[in-house]
Amino acid sequence: MRALASPASLKGVLSARDAAALLAEGFRRGGVEAKALPIADGGEGTAEVLGARVRERVRVSDAFGRPRDAPIRALADGTAVVEAAEAIPLDPRRLDPLTASSRGLGELIARVEADRLLVCLGGTANVDGGAGLREVVRELPAPTTVFCDALVPLRDAARRFAPQKGATPDQVELLEKQLASLSELAPSPGKP
């Protein structure tokens, strides 16, 4: 028998790489040939799974405006990789989706100097539809690919994600209205 140990990260407990190694070792102890192959869904830990190395650390604002350091990583081909969760992470000790902002991710992206950029979304404290990011970044610094674990329109995002960020039912409704207004301002795909 052979086994393939391919977990994603276990939030706050183990990275995908460490979880895969431990699972594979457990299989081997049971006499099973095993290979560790960590995976990621575009959220936390994606940069590590892709083999991106830290190129520099920059000071950004967390979701509540407090300073924190976040890495800009690079793949072997020079593509820059940033993870939203490293700039504006979801912290279970501070859940306030009405004030959490994506501005820090914008600050991180604004510091990127590369020919290509990969942005990994997920594991964030905010439900602002990228409004904070847009305050800082008017134009992306390079052709950009976004990795995310769920494709959800702005109009459904608060219902889907705000409760995990601490929103009450009334706050979810308020956030839904705010995101619906924001979606009216966003251009349609393929239109300026």
Give names to the regions the model predicted:
Residues M1-P192:
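N-terminal loops that bind phosphate or other acidic moieties
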